Amino acid sequence: MSEEKAVSTEERGSRKVRTGYVVSDKMEKTIVVELEDRVKHPLYGKIIRRTSKVKAHDENGVAGIGDRVQLMETRPLSATKHWRLVEVLEKAK
């Protein structure tokens, strides 16, 4: 009696990757990053800057205020934290 093991190759969805600037690093293992989105006004056509702040997980505490960082979407780590730090692209001067 040979049983075939059903291997489910469940693919995870593509995760969003965003770039932004660190505006706060006062929490332990958490940074606040400001993400900028440029959208076109639906009626007038002008390009508008829209910003949003997200909390991201910084395991080693390497990012500081003013650093340009790359974030990746992840599972919910807390009530407000759904992003994690991938790398620091540019340190603040």
From Swiss-Prot:
Record-level GO BP terms: translation
Q: Name one GO cellular component term.
A: cytosolic small ribosomal subunit
Q: Which InterPro entries match?
A: NA-bd_OB-fold, Ribosomal_uS17, Ribosomal_uS17_bact/chlr, Ribosomal_uS17_CS
**Keywords assigned by UniProt, alphabetized:** Ribonucleoprotein, Ribosomal protein, RNA-binding, rRNA-binding
Which Gene Ontology MF annotations are present?
rRNA binding; structural constituent of ribosome
Query: Electron transport: is it a keyword of this entry?
Result: no
Entry-linked Gene3D superfamilies: Nucleic acid-binding proteins
Highest taxon in the source lineage: Bacteria
Q: What does this protein do?
A: One of the primary rRNA binding proteins, it binds specifically to the 5'-end of 16S ribosomal RNA.
Quaternary assembly:
Part of the 30S ribosomal subunit.
What's the family? Belongs to the universal ribosomal protein uS17 family.
The name this protein carries in UniProt is: Small ribosomal subunit protein uS17
| Species | Rhodococcus opacus (strain B4)
